[in-house]
Amino acid sequence: MVDRLANSEANTRRISIVESCFGAAGQPLTIPGRVLIGEGVLTKLCRKKPKARQFFLFNDILVYGNIVIQKKKYNKQHIIPLENVTIDSIKDEGELRNGWLIKTPTKSFAVYAATATEKSEWMNHINKCVTDLLSKSGKTPSNEHAAVWVPDSEATVCMRCQKAKFTPVNRRHHCRKCGFVVCGPCSEKRFLLPSQSSKPVRICDFCYDLLSTGDMAACQPTRSDSYSQSLKSPLNDASDDDDDDDSSD
């Protein structure tokens, strides 16, 4: 079906509409063989609060952006190659329901659908696209993924020393390896994580010690379904600001 749609006028028109919604700041999306599989609004768990984001699933990439005017204008376009994507379901917990993790070597995050059916459809379509891509390319799924950042609202004290309380002066930072919220003194070191940046990035002392000894796996994040506190803040429907988890800290 995907091959049949690839060169259809309807598919070309749909992709052109998506391009126009992102405007000149967005990347061109029309290439031979690319098919728009589906689209919809998902709640993305950002650093400070959950936010509505518009997602577009193509047969080779996943695109999302901030909603300025629904179905008319989006900005802050992000493009994720599907061949690098792994997804994992998240258990329902309180108000956080119908979620899954989108994991890549450069960035990982949680998203939530409005219904269980919508979640199932998204996950099934993403998995099929990834499987088809890997089958055609002969590549193997990536086993290295960036940490999913723990939302700021889940940590009132440093998650490493368990002592430092966060205040407007004592700021929160995120370890790029484990995703924990940590204080400045517990994250003064930097380490080169090539999949995330060409420059050394901030990591916590715990991960630094493990990485320095070559124990890369020991500091892999384990908190895949613990985001319950983040929905205590209301959903920000006006999503014309940057993703909070794109900040430097």
Swiss-Prot record:
<feature type="domain" description="PH">
    <location>
        <begin position="35"/>
        <end position="131"/>
    </location>
</feature>
<dbReference type="InterPro" id="IPR013083">
    <property type="entry name" value="Znf_RING/FYVE/PHD"/>
</dbReference>
<feature type="modified residue" description="Phosphoserine">
    <location>
        <position position="16"/>
    </location>
</feature>
<keyword id="KW-0479">Metal-binding</keyword>
<feature type="binding site">
    <location>
        <position position="158"/>
    </location>
    <ligand>
        <name>Zn(2+) 1</name>
    </ligand>
</feature>
<feature type="binding site">
    <location>
        <position position="178"/>
    </location>
    <ligand>
        <name>Zn(2+) 2</name>
    </ligand>
</feature>
<dbReference type="GO" id="GO:0008270">
    <property type="term" value="F:zinc ion binding"/>
</dbReference>
<feature type="compositionally biased region" description="Polar residues">
    <location>
        <begin position="221"/>
        <end position="233"/>
    </location>
</feature>
<dbReference type="GO" id="GO:0031901">
    <property type="term" value="C:early endosome membrane"/>
</dbReference>
<keyword id="KW-0597">Phosphoprotein</keyword>
<feature type="binding site">
    <location>
        <position position="183"/>
    </location>
    <ligand>
        <name>Zn(2+) 1</name>
    </ligand>
</feature>
<comment type="function">
    <text>May play a role in early endosome fusion upstream of RAB5, hence regulating receptor trafficking and fluid-phase transport. Enhances cellular sensitivity to TNF-induced apoptosis.</text>
</comment>
<dbReference type="Pfam" id="PF01363">
    <property type="entry name" value="FYVE"/>
</dbReference>
<feature type="modified residue" description="Phosphoserine">
    <location>
        <position position="239"/>
    </location>
</feature>
<keyword id="KW-0472">Membrane</keyword>
<dbReference type="InterPro" id="IPR037871">
    <property type="entry name" value="PH_Phafin"/>
</dbReference>
<keyword id="KW-0863">Zinc-finger</keyword>
<keyword id="KW-0813">Transport</keyword>
<keyword id="KW-0967">Endosome</keyword>
<keyword id="KW-0256">Endoplasmic reticulum</keyword>
<keyword id="KW-0007">Acetylation</keyword>
<dbReference type="GO" id="GO:0005783">
    <property type="term" value="C:endoplasmic reticulum"/>
</dbReference>
<feature type="binding site">
    <location>
        <position position="161"/>
    </location>
    <ligand>
        <name>Zn(2+) 1</name>
    </ligand>
</feature>
<feature type="binding site">
    <location>
        <position position="175"/>
    </location>
    <ligand>
        <name>Zn(2+) 2</name>
    </ligand>
</feature>
<dbReference type="InterPro" id="IPR051765">
    <property type="entry name" value="PH_domain-containing_F"/>
</dbReference>
<feature type="region of interest" description="Disordered">
    <location>
        <begin position="221"/>
        <end position="249"/>
    </location>
</feature>
<dbReference type="InterPro" id="IPR000306">
    <property type="entry name" value="Znf_FYVE"/>
</dbReference>
<dbReference type="GO" id="GO:0015031">
    <property type="term" value="P:protein transport"/>
</dbReference>
<feature type="modified residue" description="N6-acetyllysine">
    <location>
        <position position="44"/>
    </location>
</feature>
<dbReference type="InterPro" id="IPR001849">
    <property type="entry name" value="PH_domain"/>
</dbReference>
<dbReference type="GO" id="GO:0030133">
    <property type="term" value="C:transport vesicle"/>
</dbReference>
<dbReference type="Pfam" id="PF00169">
    <property type="entry name" value="PH"/>
</dbReference>
<comment type="subunit">
    <text>May interact with EEA1.</text>
</comment>
<keyword id="KW-0862">Zinc</keyword>
<keyword id="KW-0653">Protein transport</keyword>
<feature type="modified residue" description="Phosphoserine">
    <location>
        <position position="248"/>
    </location>
</feature>
<dbReference type="InterPro" id="IPR047966">
    <property type="entry name" value="PLEKHF2_FYVE"/>
</dbReference>
<protein>
    <recommendedName>
        <fullName>Pleckstrin homology domain-containing family F member 2</fullName>
    </recommendedName>
</protein>
<feature type="binding site">
    <location>
        <position position="204"/>
    </location>
    <ligand>
        <name>Zn(2+) 2</name>
    </ligand>
</feature>
<feature type="zinc finger region" description="FYVE-type">
    <location>
        <begin position="152"/>
        <end position="212"/>
    </location>
</feature>
<dbReference type="InterPro" id="IPR011993">
    <property type="entry name" value="PH-like_dom_sf"/>
</dbReference>
<dbReference type="InterPro" id="IPR011011">
    <property type="entry name" value="Znf_FYVE_PHD"/>
</dbReference>
